[in-house]
Regions:
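N-terminal nucleophile
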Residues: 1-118
């Protein structure tokens, strides 16, 4: 349910999604205000580009910060770097996702595998 005139984060480049040839691509989901105020998709890609191999750690940290600053809001993202590194993280009990790379069998998930503090 959205208030009249409210625009969510999804259509806003940098918040709900972002793609760049040198940075990769990222899509977000969750409470729009938390995602918008942190420009989550862009920031996750920008920071992951500075520390290759650590995209999941960086994305998890950004999601946790966005969630904390908005009273535990549900926030999640899927990030893919140009080198193929993938990060799928969320600060919520559930976030459905699926991943298929090349000829490998697809993978998918719904629940967090880690405790909320990790």
């Amino acid at each position: 349910h959205k208030l009249p005139g409210r625009v969510g984060d999804t259509p806003l480049c940098g918040a709900g999604f972002y793609a760049h040839p040198q940075l990769g691509a990222c899509g977000t989901t969750g409470v729009g205000e938390a995602i918008l105020t942190h420009v989550l998709a862009f920031e996750a890609l920008r920071r992951a580009s500075e520390r290759p191999g650590e995209a999941a750690i960086i994305a998890a940290s950004l999601c946790a910060a966005a969630s904390r600053h908005h009273n535990g809001a549900a926030v999640g993202l899927i990030l893919v770097r140009p080198d193929g590194e993938v990060a799928i993280v969320h600060c919520s009990e559930h976030m459905s996702w699926a991943l298929a790379i090349g000829d490998a069998a697809p993978d998918s998930g719904l629940r967090r595998d880690l405790s909320p503090g990790t």
